[in-house]
């Protein structure tokens, strides 16, 4: 099925932080099975259980899915790691890109993430400070906290509410 160009350009964007959101510790969270050797030596991060399903489902529902992280992992590293889980992001903003495109030469230190600068409608994060700044800087955020077996359903529902609200405007 081919989509019209205007439909693709108007797709709502959802972004995820990496650390403590998609990458979690198996000591505190349920995780996807580790990658097989030798990839488990290259990519030591463990994915929160359900991450590939959630990202692929969001894309099937018509959302663009991005990574927006303050980490300085390269875009290439992120792409290759997630390829092993059959996940392809629509966009990636890492710490390097954020500094170059958002912070630039601004004398005032801006927050580590400003999702609305990339037309991201919903950002998923664990950091309380980023969530508190959302109202001040005009972006929507869903704070993902501890282990939550229903996290996928909650994020899909939250994204649907925002998409509905945006279509009313």
Protein language model regions, located:
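Alpha-helical substrate-recognition element adjacent to the catalytic core
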Residues: 1-101
């Amino acid at each position: 099925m081919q989509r019209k160009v205007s439909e693709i350009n108007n797709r709502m964007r959802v972004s995820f932080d990496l650390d403590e959101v998609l990458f979690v510790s198996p000591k505190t969270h349920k995780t996807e099975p580790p990658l097989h050797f030798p990839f488990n030596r290259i990519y030591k991060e463990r994915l929160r259980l359900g991450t590939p399903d959630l990202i692929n489902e969001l894309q099937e529902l018509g959302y663009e899915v991005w990574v927006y992280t303050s980490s300085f992992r390269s875009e290439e590293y992120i792409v290759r790691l997630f390829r092993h889980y059959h996940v392809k992001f629509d966009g990636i903003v890492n710490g390097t890109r954020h500094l170059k495109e958002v912070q630039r030469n601004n004398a005032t230190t801006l927050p580590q993430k400003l999702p609305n600068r990339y037309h991201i409608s919903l950002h998923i994060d664990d950091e309380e400070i980023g969530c508190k700044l959302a109202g001040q800087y005009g972006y929507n955020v869903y704070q993902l906290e501890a282990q939550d077996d229903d996290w996928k359903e909650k994020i899909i529902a939250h994204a649907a509410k925002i998409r509905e609200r945006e279509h009313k405007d």
